[in-house]
């Protein structure tokens, strides 16, 4: 039931992504009226909450579209960043943030909530973390009050950080790692806590115009995180050998080969771990009274949800939704991108529904019905090129929706 005091519209950008796709149902449960601003509206068609929200199709890089999308909005979430985008991601992120800030001012929005990356401004960080800090500053340059939450590693079923941790520990009983794995500290936080904070700061005047650090109760090295995962998963303690010669670039290739993550995303995650990312200046505990989940419990919860096929969103949804230059099926031919379509027809003695239910299981553990070894070669070639290969698998063994991964393919319609 709607809360009578929550009549304003709350806009959510990045609703097809990992965090945004989980935030929307939380906002609905809290009684808010939600407008999802997305580039591809079909990506939300199969969400259980689709009929409860307003969907507005807009490209965040186009000012006129963003101004229209924010018309009538009271407050807005900015959950867009380009962890796996192209080399010009910094310019793209800055441009979109500036457009969004100006559009918010024009529409007299009361608050922007932005999820950024944890880390002190004056330190030398990775290009992606530096860009996320810059986006926060650009959003704050306008007249609309901004609440910026900064988080480091997010642990949850389907998150990129969790999948990297999971793959490394489960695949490799012995690891040769760069020395920062045993030295730099991070403060992981559960996705459930992130969602709680995102909802809680919305109507909290104490958070307006503030940069707030968010983290769980544990401060650990990445080696300690891997040992914790092994313990929770019931695996033997991994042998981790630090060496001084593995650069982030070499490490990202190694992660790409052993995990479902594409090399650009792996590099972004690794770069973010090469310096300390812990809560320091303005902790969320000073604003909200909430007992965050420790790493042991958050890993256990994530593993349980994976085993029970409870993965409402996955990192692969975020990668696709955040790369604006990737083509969509609905894009006109003059736009430059193109989705190739190979259409085949074959008569069948069974119903279309039965055929489709079988087709929907393709890929992942099921395989490709014919010439599996050729698909394996295709996946290996994709890995060599820095892609996801076959390890990305599927979100669910028998369900498909727009945006879902099927090994190295993505469902577009």
Regions found by a protein language model. Give the residues of each.
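Glycine-rich portal/gate segments that line the openings of hydrophobic small-molecule binding cavities
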Residues: 339-340, 347-413
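Conserved glycine-rich Rossmann-like NAD(P)H-binding loop of the short-chain dehydrogenase/reductase
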Residues: 32-39
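Conserved beta-loop-beta element that borders a ligand/cofactor-binding pocket
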Residues: 116, 137-158, 164-170, 179
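N-terminal Rossmann NAD(P)H-binding glycine-rich loop of SDR-like oxidoreductase domains
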Residues: 2-32
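Substrate-positioning beta->alpha
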Residues: 96, 160-161, 181-202, 210, ...
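Mid/C-terminal beta-alpha module of Rossmann-like enzyme folds, strongest
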Residues: 2-4, 9, 200-265, 276-344
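NAD(P)H-binding glycine-rich loop region in Rossmannoid oxidoreductase-like domains
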Residues: 42, 46-107, 117-124
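SDR active-site strand-loop-helix element
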Residues: 13, 37, 79, 112-117, ...
């Amino acid at each position: 039931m709607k809360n009578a005091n929550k009549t304003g519209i709350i806009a959510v950008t990045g609703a097809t992504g990992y965090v945004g796709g989980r935030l929307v149902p939380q906002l609905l449960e809290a009684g808010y009226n939600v407008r999802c601003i997305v580039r591809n509206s079909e990506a939300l068609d199969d969400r259980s909450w689709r009929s409860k929200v307003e969907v507005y199709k807009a490209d965040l890089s186009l000012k006129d579209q963003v101004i229209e999308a924010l018309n009538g909005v009271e407050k807005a979430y900015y959950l867009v960043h380009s962890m796996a985008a192209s080399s010009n991601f910094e310019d793209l992120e800055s441009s979109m943030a500036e457009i969004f800030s100006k559009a918010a001012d024009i529409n007299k929005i009361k608050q922007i909530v932005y999820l950024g990356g944890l880390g002190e401004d004056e330190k030398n960080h990775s290009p992606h973390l530096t860009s996320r800090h810059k986006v926060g500053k650009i959003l704050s340059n306008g007249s609309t009050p901004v609440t910026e939450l900064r988080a480091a590693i997010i642990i949850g079923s389907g998150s990129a950080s969790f999948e990297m941790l999971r793959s490394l520990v489960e695949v490799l009983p012995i690891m040769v790692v760069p020395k920062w794995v045993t030295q730099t500290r991070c403060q992981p936080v559960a996705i459930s806590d992130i969602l709680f904070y995102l909802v809680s700061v919305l109507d909290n005047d104490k958070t307006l115009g503030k940069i707030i650090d968010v983290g769980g109760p544990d401060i650990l090295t990445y080696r300690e995180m891997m040992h914790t995962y092994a313990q929770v998963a019931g695996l033997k303690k991994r042998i981790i050998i630090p060496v001084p010669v593995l650069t982030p670039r070499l490490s990202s290739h190694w992660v790409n080969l052993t995990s479902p993550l594409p090399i650009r995303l792996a590099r972004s995650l690794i770069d973010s771990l090469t310096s300390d990312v812990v809560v320091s200046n303005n902790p969320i505990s000073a604003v909200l009274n909430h007992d965050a989940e420790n790493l042991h419990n958050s890993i256990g919860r994530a593993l349980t949800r994976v085993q029970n096929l409870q993965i409402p969103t996955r990192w692969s949804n975020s990668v696709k939704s955040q790369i604006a230059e990737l083509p969509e099926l609905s894009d006109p031919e003059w736009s430059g991108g193109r989705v190739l379509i190979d259409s085949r027809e074959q008569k069948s003695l069974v119903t279309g529904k039965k055929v489709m239910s079988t087709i929907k299981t393709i890929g992942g553990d099921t395989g490709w019905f014919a010439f599996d070894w050729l698909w394996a070669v295709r996946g290996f070639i994709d890995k060599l090129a820095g892609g996801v290969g076959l390890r990305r698998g599927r979100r669910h063994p028998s369900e498909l929706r727009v945006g879902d991964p099927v090994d190295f393919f993505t469902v577009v319609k």
